[in-house]
Amino acid sequence: MAKKIVSDLDLKGKTVLVRADFNVPLKDGEITNDNRIVQALPTIQYIIEQGGKIVLFSHLGKVKEESDKAKLTLRPVAEDLSKKLDKEVVFVPETRGEKLEAAIKDLKEGDVLLVENTRYEDLDGKKESKNDPELGKYWASLGDVFVNDAFGTAHREHASNVGISTHLETAAGFLMDKEIKFIGGVVNDPHKPVVAILGGAKVSDKINVIKNLVNIADKIIIGGGMAYTFLKAQGKEIGISLLEEDKIDFAKDLLEKHGDKIVLPVDTKVAKEFSNDAKITVVPSDSIPADQEGMDIGPNTVKLFADELEGAHTVVWNGPMGVFEFSNFAQGTIGVCKAIANLKDAITIIGGGDSAAAAISLGFENDFTHISTGGGASLEYLEGKELPGIKAINNK
């Protein structure tokens, strides 16, 4: 069933509670990456135009003790959002109480208010993270309708997403709707042929994604640290490269059953130490020297992966191809980014996390159909799970 979206609601004069994902990185109180705020703007601007009164909720980091509160306040987000919207955003440094209730009552049509970090409530018995029913009910009492636009927490059952939606008519924001359309589309109704590119350090992080996508994708390209477990499963020499011994049998089984679908690196950039300044050698992937470790896919692999992408109608990528934080070992990830960006007729999706960070930091954010804002949420969606935050949105 299609989910309700914000444009299905009558918003004029209504107090609209919006769960956004403003869980942005901060350094010394300054926002270092505003992508999540930018992604939330279309929904906020639409509600302003429709004459709604907006009450925004978000978490920021993990609040474990009282001393965490000062460094995990949403005040910098309110200031940034105010600049982006070119209007005052009322910031209430509380998560409940008379001050918050009075500020909400004072809102006029088109006004925007941001509630303090929802995880401040976790200091008292983890009320937010454990979806305390009274907290969800209280927050719901502050508004007329609820819009969930926080895909990044859709895999969590928290008071500020699932809890509120239990008591109010709930619709997806435009970002959430986009995530359902693109990430959900890969799993539920993909435009074939589908190529999945999986990277990152560990097979264990992606094991359920692989199990699900192997039945959907026409090809699964495997790079990053996780590739070495697959190469080892083929009996190849991987030196001191990252290896998950307990996943070799899984890799063997997958290669036996679906070997025709799986594409592995043919050459590897290796080094003796885990450092950007280490001496680099490119070797065939089946003969990595005993004292060296794979740090990135090699140039022949970049070409192979690019060739495998040709003709794909849907491409989903999750996980970098090497240690992209080191500039000398970022070429594999850059090469894959370029290859996907060049596919003009394909739906190209980055499933959040490190690969999204890599694409954005490398300047490719406008070259993909969709870059997901979810890390864990994207992975669980690609695993084929029903996410609680999405389940709680009303059907049309």
Curated annotation (Swiss-Prot):
Record's keyword terms, sorted: ATP-binding, Cytoplasm, Glycolysis, Kinase, Nucleotide-binding, Transferase
Any one GO biological process: gluconeogenesis
EC annotation from Swiss-Prot or TrEMBL: 2.7.2.3
Pfam family membership, one: PGK
Pathway(s) per entry: Carbohydrate degradation; glycolysis; pyruvate from D-glyceraldehyde 3-phosphate: step 2/5
Cellular compartments per GO CC: cytosol
MF annotations from Gene Ontology: ADP binding; ATP binding; phosphoglycerate kinase activity
Protein origin, superkingdom: Bacteria
Binding site for substrate: 21-23, 36, 59-62, 119, 156
Listed CDD domains: Phosphoglycerate_kinase
Signal peptide start-end: none
Reaction catalysis annotation: (2R)-3-phosphoglycerate + ATP = (2R)-3-phospho-glyceroyl phosphate + ADP
Family (UniProt): Belongs to the phosphoglycerate kinase family.
Family matches, as HAMAP family: Phosphoglyc_kinase (MF_00145)
Oligomer status and interactors: Monomer.
Protein name per Swiss-Prot or TrEMBL: Phosphoglycerate kinase
Taxonomic source organism: Staphylococcus aureus (strain MRSA252)
